[in-house]
């Protein structure tokens, strides 16, 4: 059996986490098994991962304690790297490529870097680190994957993109989960008290990238035209309270629902009438694919 060490799972069941789990659920686990190296003490889908046979190893996050992170990562790799035929690192920027550096040092022969974004809102220092690591990633990783052609230049220079080890791996979803279902639509619209509303949906963490402020401004104009519009915001994040305050200031609390993190997002699509994703940047937004699979008009 080939064992793959996977990095990319956090405490948030977001886009990258969904991509990883979609593959994990559908691979032949008699031939390939995933283990997960995480820097979060709470891991999305943890129970499911364990039920599928995967192991989860948790280390300190680099942002919490850099030196402890390096010690724990070194200790893990020195004691476990020999078990793995590959490491698959799923990230949105090249600020932290230590997982690949240590994987190379301790002998993991196949080292996959998988790009999941087309830009980043990092400050000056992190942007400089990203650019520096972009120049050297070609000598650290062995395989260079990207979720889209638009995202690739953010991670890879022309030399990498012209090489045989570069590949576009488009995000995959199980379309059957999102098939239109009138019974679910009726059930969820009833639960939310939205039987007669025009439901505008958005799924994403409350973060600068997702552009919630702009979405609220647009929604305010919609409500002026038709009071039956209702905005459904699915997710959580550091800007959630700020967005709630903006909604309050605009007097829209009755027209906007905040659901928090949901593990039944595929069902929430059923109650929507239109899906909006006004992100400042995306690699290949998996929620947009899911919404289209649910036959929703998407903006």
Residues covered by each model-derived region:
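Aromatic "clamp/platform" in nucleotide-sugar-dependent glycosyltransferases that forms part
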Residues: 92, 261, 280
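Acidic donor-binding loop of glycosyltransferase active sites
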Residues: 270-283, 296-297
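Short hydrophobic beta-strand element within catalytic cores of glycosyltransferases
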Residues: 38, 288, 297-299
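Active-site donor-binding acidic/aromatic loop of nucleotide-activated sugar
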Residues: 239-242, 252-261, 268
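A conserved mid-protein helix/loop that constitutes part of the nucleotide-sugar donor-binding site
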Residues: 14-22, 198, 202-221, 227, ...
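A short, active-site helix/loop in glycosyltransferases that binds the activated sugar's phosphate group
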Residues: 140-179
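A short helix/loop element that forms part of the nucleotide-sugar donor recognition site in Leloir-type
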Residues: 73, 179-193
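N-terminal strand-loop element at the rim of the active site
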Residues: 6-14, 18, 22-68, 165-166, ...
